[in-house]
Amino acid sequence: MDHEAEAHRTDLMTITRYVLNEQSRHQESRGDFTILLSHIVLGCKFVCSAVNKAGLAKLIGLAGETNVQGGSKRKLDVLSNEVFVKALISSGRTCILVSEEDEEATFVDPSLRGKYCVVFDPLDGSSNIDCGVSIGTIFGVYMVKDKDNVTLDEVLQPGKNMLAAGYCMYGSSCTLVLSTGSGVNGFTLDPSLGEFILTHPDIKIPKKGKIYSVNEGNAKNWDGPTTKYVEKCKFPKDGDSPKSLRYIGSMVADVHRTLLYGGIFLYPADKKSPNGKLRVLYEVFPMSFLMEQAGGQAFTGKQRALDLVPTKIHQRSPIFLGSYDEVEEIKALYAAEENTA
């Protein structure tokens, strides 16, 4: 290995170093967020290890319980939820947690409380575990006004109030994508070091894309604007080439591809799910936050996604997110329908 390659190998930007550098830019910072993030990262490493060993360790399969969404809990879901709840509480920096797996919010014991609220889906896309498809953890972080008198209202904030959001994808590699409100960066877990290394600095989504990502099995139940947009993707009338359909069925994997390559991810409302399918707090908001930070847009069919004010912790919403121009097209179709109504 030549000297230049060796220097590159040893001068690594780890996620801890990155966050400490960000912290040093804010003189008022006391390091609380850095500590919180280190516990989130630890949870991601643990779950990554468990996912990789799932088949051998008999973690695949049903655990005999059901979660608040009505789905049967898979063993890895249960384990992942326990890991993140314990990691977040033990950080001493959280006061309230909302998990996709738990019906009620978790209020942290006053002796361990900090100033942050964390919303998370510990293992999104877990129905794909058996076939080896990429799955992931999604999280968002808010700050509360008064950690000693925290209420559920602290969680029911619009997404634009988030301090940070991210996801960790467990696939051919373990990739953590993070935004602390000043751009988006991607880190890949180096198994030999046990550290997340900066591999995708300052991610920017292309302004236009050639890929659309949607479950077309629901097409017969879609509304007019969604149907028109997808038809235009497949049969463009302006001489352009049709867009390619790519749909994995794991939100983390589909959004990750959209973020890197451009295009649009759609999970619209339909007759079967008039309020949409994805949960606002720990799916729609974190992914919308990341998209906007990367130069894209996120839209619910009625408004900017991050302006939505949730009223319930497991509230659902339609979502269209991705490249700026693609989401702009969807917005124009909804506006046109509203004008003719």
Swiss-Prot record:
UniProt GO BP: fructose 1,6-bisphosphate metabolic process; fructose 6-phosphate metabolic process; fructose metabolic process; gluconeogenesis; sucrose biosynthetic process
Organism of provenance: Musa acuminata (Banana)
Give the binding site residues for Mg(2+) 2: 100, 121, 123
Catalysed reactions listed for this entry: beta-D-fructose 1,6-bisphosphate + H2O = beta-D-fructose 6-phosphate + phosphate
Residue positions binding Mg(2+) 1: 100
Give me the residues that bind substrate, please: 124-127, 215, 247, 267, 277
User: What would you give as a GO molecular function for this chain, any one?
Assistant: fructose 1,6-bisphosphate 1-phosphatase activity
Q: Which UniProt keywords apply?
A: Carbohydrate metabolism, Cytoplasm, Hydrolase, Magnesium, Metal-binding
Output this protein's name: Fructose-1,6-bisphosphatase, cytosolic
Task: Name the family the entry cites.
Answer: Belongs to the FBPase class 1 family.
